Amino acid sequence: RVCFFTNNSSKAAEDYIEKLHKMGLDISRDEIYTSGEVTCEYVNRVYPGASVFVMGNEKLKAEFIRHGIKLSEDNPDLCVLGFDTELEYWKLYRFCKWLNKGKPYIATHPDLNCPADECPMPDIGGMILFINATISRNPDIIIGKPEREAGEGVKRKFNLPANKIAMVGDRLYTDIAFGFNNGFKTVLVLSGETTEEMVSASDRKPDVILPFVKDLIK
């Protein structure tokens, strides 16, 4: 079985299905899993019935609504930081005000940037630093790769033990660290962010290193 797991909480699963179909891959909805989905599952399990201030775009908000979670920017029970591609300054300020009052603080993932053609896009990692510099708070929990909560979500979703799962990715600090943190086999592909020099300098070595994802089937 195959699962495409993405930390990008600004996209819906349907966006990735469309993208992968254009690449010639016959992928079903059940084979896509996002950090936004795992976050919703976590909120429903740990904070059932809670209202949530979602710092994210409309697609992430729709994911929370799909999971039956009430959204509120007026006295929410907890706050969730997502990859907000519709960021507004005063929305960020309201978010900080609730965090400053001690509301539980969840981040969907920790990535510093999101790959883009001309220049990497600022991602949640930068917003975490921004908020910490403003009110001296870090997330109480981060959900996506490389954290264990996402790994537990994958195991629950596919009803598989850790030793039956292999993590394939191109980032050492999210993808490969995700495998290590959750007891999965790790496969690094060199077609993205990571170079052989970066692997040599890392204290965590992947189980397998391949030039491209397609080499998995050779």
Question: Where are these predicted regions, by residue range?
Answer:
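Asp-based, Mg2+/Mn2+-dependent phosphohydrolase catalytic module
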Residues: 3, 9-33, 37-218
